[in-house]
Swiss-Prot record:
Organism: Drosophila sechellia
Gene: Mat89Ba
Record's protein name: Nucleolar protein 6
Subcellular location: Nucleus, Nucleolus; Chromosome
Biased composition (Basic residues): 1165-1174
GO annotation terms (biological process): ribosomal small subunit biogenesis; rRNA processing; tRNA export from nucleus
Amino acid sequence: MPGKLVGSSEEAARTGTQANAHAEDHSDLEHSAPSTDDGFDEPKPPIAKSVPPSTAIPKKNNFKQRGNTKNVKPPTLEEMKELRDTQNLFHSNLFKLQVKEMLEELQLKQKYTDFIENWLESFTVFTRQLKDGLMERTHLEVPMKLSEKPTGFVFSKPTREPYLIGAAATGTLLGPKIVVDVALEMPKESLHKEDYLNLRYDQKRALYLTYVTERMMESPDYAQDQFNFNYYANNPLKPVLELIPVTKQVNKHLQVRLFITAPLSSFKPGRFVPWNNNIRPSFYGDEWDEQDPLPSTQHYNANVLFDLTLSENQAQLDKAFKSRRNFQDGLLLLKVWLRQRQLDIGYSGFGAHILAAFIVYLNKQRILHQSSSSYQVARTVWNQLANTDWTKGISLAVDPIQTEELNKFAEHYDVCFIDFTGQHNLCANIPLYLYKRVREEAKLAVELLNDMKLNSFPLIFMQKCPLYSRVDNILKISNYSCINQMLTLHSQPRIKYDFANYGYPQLLHLLTELLKKGLAERVHSILPLETATAAWPVENKAPVIGKYIQLGLILQPEHAYEVLNKGPAANDDLAGAEEFRRFWGEKSNLRRFQDGSITEAVVWGTAQDSPAKKRLIVRHVVLHLLEHHLQLDSKEVQYIGGELDQVYKLSPWFKVNKLKTKLSLDQDTDAEALSPHVIRCYDELARQLHGLNDLPLEIVSISGVSPIFRYCEPQPVLPQALLVENRILASTIQRVVIQLGQSGKWPTELGALRALKTAFLIEIGEKLEAQCRLHWVISADGLLVLKQGYCFLIELAHNKELALLKQEVTERGITTYVDNAASRFLERQHYILPKVSGALHSLHQTYSAFGSTVLLAKRWLATQLLDDGLWPDMATELLVAHLFQQRYAPQSIAAPQTGFIRFLQLLSHSDFNGELFLLNFNNSWQEQQIADLEHNYRSNRQSYPPLAVATSYDMQHAGRLWTSDQSPSQRVLGHVTRLARRALEIIETSLMSKDLRFVRPAQLFRASNEGYDLVIQFKPDLVPNSLSYDLGSPFVSFSQPNFSLPRAGSDYIARIVGLLRSAYSDFAAFFYNPHGGKELAIVWRPTTEFAAKPFKVTELQACRPCGNGKVQVLKETLLEDFKLLLKDFYLRIATPEELKREQREHQKPMRYFEANQAVEESKPKPKKHRKRKGTGKEAPPKKKRLIKSSTLKALK
């Protein structure tokens, strides 16, 4: 179960070691006793009394520093050696302790070791009691599709005792579910000399397994056990028995897999060399020209050789690993690393047995030594994996293989690693792209180890990195008839024979070759995404597998979104141009380019297309290739890439053609595509500000600090701001900070200085109106400027204001300067945020997926009813920036959807209590500064907020500037972690299932309506809708959207919710969607907060007397307070259950309009007006219109 290795990394990290790689089931593991051969050179117990290891380093320091050393013993030789090894091999003593503790926890409990030994002895006795005989009818199903009925099979008693293979033999079993592999060898007499042909060996192997299984089920020793068949490594030619012993000793945490093998001498030497054919075309009813050579079946041959060479290979591995704790522990480290990346799953998986053989290979090459520590073993393997090329072939053969023969071997496989016998390729089924991926992951591991600024242990061993989270796009084909059609019409006969007509590797080869040629430089890797085959009861028929395929594409950001595929010139290369037209079909056209060349070309879009459209180019290419070459309709294919981009698209309810603007806007535009328009408008405004004449002081710097200037605004910003009656109406404002030249004439009193700032802003507004014809309005927050339909808020920053905010006068009259909440806020907004905003803008220029990943992350958090007061927007931006800055994967993120999945992983698996998220922009932090900050963080953790984020521009506020104790609080942080884990489960289930389609945005971007006590509905006409795509409310059905423009900068709902939190956070928690949400969800605090308490003058809020000198908080009183604060915005209060009942009964919740109508109906009807005399006509009826409240009028 590779996907469940790490179940509770947070708990392990709290211990300071992050070493519990099997927290899902602690009962499998135990702490082993210290060993002198564990690769860390543990201090051996000397004859004299030794100094404890934990005090070795401090005593060494004391020995140097103190003059009185009479009672202090110097370190022992063992302790000195251990310290020297720590300094030479590891980043720090912490890393060494983390590795050491993880290895100790990976060791099996003695009860499992005893059980395995006893079970093997019992099974050996059972096999001795088996009798030779004819296999007649069986109530079990043979776990293989046979060409004919199993009649006449003669069972021969095994002549060799069963033996352990794999991890059980080398002492490297890994939990949480322990899988013990046992091999049972068929005797040579069971096979005939012609059994190498046409799957006869494989059929006999399956029959032999069935016979042994049936006898085991009849034996009283195994009567209570659970029997299942399964395919080893998703290979239908490799059925194995999976037996789960039912005993209290192992408690169903152990599984035994029985492999049937055969001796190497069963067939003539050289019968299964890669260039031989062992499956005849006639076996599948095909005709073959006798004059043509038969195609080689190298992959089928390797499949048989796996069984034939297993005994010899295992003997050599046992010899290499026996009593070598360092090799065993090194292999355990590598297995953890491999399993966390899910590179060992399925038919094409890079199995741990390959790494075990590679350790022996490096030992033979004298790259690894007997005395190498476990850490050195793992590091050396990663380093050699990254820097050696197996495509040319490497060999473990006892008898050296000539270079010519090795090259001949390598020609038949993508990857070649010859085993000890010199006949079997251990990497026969590994495709080239997957091997390259393993090399890249190994290279990344070495780079992480070499980064002295980083604690690489959790990144290498603790974090789950499923393969689907490493790819940018995913291609799924699961239609059974389409798969059969492709295999029948397009799979080459030689490939069919090579893989014994197994569909999966044929599909993998067919699609990989086609996409590799069609995508070319657009794609970096094409990786198979496999899931392990599920076991089935032995009484059931073997399932048909291989009729489904899923590929992951890792894109090259530099070339993936190019709109043109340019072919050869028609005049210079006629054959090449013809081949280009044949490959691309009707998409190819002859085009003339600006340089005068005339070539064949395929155009997939225009240079002016939005980033979201360009990200779909690879999708269009893939679907065209499948349709043109494989006749596969796009409806039969599921291509996953960009589905979640919908959440930051413009709402279809808002019609852009009604806007009065010179900009060319599409109805299907989105927030990402609209950002450059605002940035260009801001750049022009900045030039106009710099060009203003006759200002008292020169403007020296202008900085845009709103999220849109760093491509992080999830709501589409349109040029719709208006000037109405000297008031600017705008849905959003863009903040701009300006700084002036130095002057000594500024007041030294805070109020006077702010008044002078306001006067200066007014003068700037007047100059903008006179010289640039721009409308402006002064507000309490700054100068509002209207330009091209966008509203900008200009703020003036001055150092003296910050100093005055910090200024305090002591009782003795001494003036001091002390940081406070107001000064920190001002410093962040005016001086630090401009620098961080510029750094994030630069990050987006480097990684184009950064901004859109932030958009997805912000929209997800907002739809989970988490506003800026509960989870700061800047925290989201900085966490995503942390993802792009850190080397979590060999390739940078090219697709926003992938970035969003990794953001969810960061929220799910991070240890927020022990991790400080550092963003070293421009490498402006020195190593020592980082070390000092991390040390201060660890030693004073309680002084930092629950989520600590620091940038290199934060100065003395590092770690405390962007978040606080309440935003997010510990509870909110835990809530977000649980939400992220659930979202990941939904995504992974939909991605890896062959039956389910990819998750719809509404499944992820809509909050649950469970867990809330009350819901306060707002009047929909007083709360404008967001311009972003509305995915619906978790509480009520869709309502008519309201896109009215409020007064610029007046977010009334946010202010009211802030007031509610500041006044009533001790009694309730408040949640709402800041992107146009029209409901406020409330969760009451525990009942203890509402219990009667003694009377205190300072604690009387919302209380009433309840006798005996006590007071009590009443929820009814609180609700009345809430209504009073919400004033005209409040519509009604209901419980989620009441809202659900209304939905089930198809009753619409009472809307504001209906409420008004009910009120009107309850009033006495007015008297009818009589007709005027002298006129024969009635007065025309007045049009019905909505009478807006005074609050709405105040918005204008």
